[in-house]
């Protein structure tokens, strides 16, 4: 067996061929390079201008067709599709449908703003071009409601309050039931009895709170802002009423409910209730 020719093997390796065909592989490589160069020449001639430095309107969308390379725009308000850039002045003009929809929405907003309040509220309200009602109308409505409640003569109410140093407490009660028909059909005897009952409750509450009048010495005390006497008359404790089932902060010596005027309050600290 003869040894292989080393020089022939080396020359075949240099030509990337083992059959001695010399230069076949090099020709294929040159063909591939030429085809790639030709393809790059074709792609260099295609450019697409996106104008991304200018923002589109909020209801427009910019799309690109991959097959044709065409850029088109879709208006999501009416579903139209166009190749004209909506950022230009001629294409950005609103369509008649959008103009009519916006005008109708503004009319509805103005109607809601005018219909929401009557009387003084309508006179004080101001409607802007966007259809919103100013805050002054809300204040007028609140003032009108307060005036109506203050001038309503069908109900009765009472209130009380007391303060001590830097501490204070207040309570109010309105005896109206809110039914206009029932209040208008009530007899004179029921109104007189209710007024007498309310006056008796008011006198009981006044007599109870009169014992809790702060003195000049205690009001001018330092520290926490109140002073406690020897008998504990100026100490606030939690108490519950058996009649109206409510809890109040009342003086320790008080025994009358500040709401209904009934006696026998359950002082939590005195009777040991938890």
Curated annotation (Swiss-Prot):
A single BP term in Gene Ontology: cuticle development
InterPro entries: WW_dom_sf, WWC/KIBRA_Hippo_Reg
Gene3D superfamilies membership: 2.20.70.10
Segments of this protein annotated with the region Disordered: 17-44, 83-133, 175-216
Key words, A-Z: ATP-binding, Helicase, Hydrolase, Nucleotide-binding
Residue span of motif EAR: 47-52
Low complexity: compositionally biased ranges: 87-106, 121-133, 184-207
MF-aspect GO terms: ATP binding; helicase activity; hydrolase activity
Domain (WW): residue spans on this chain: 54-88
Subunit architecture: Binds to HDG1.
PANTHER family the record matches: BOMB/KIRA PROTEINS, PROTEIN KIBRA
Functional note: Negatively regulates the cuticle development probably by interacting with the HD-ZIP IV transcription factor HDG1.
Protein name from the UniProt record: Protein CURLY FLAG LEAF 1
Species of origin: Oryza sativa subsp. japonica (Rice)
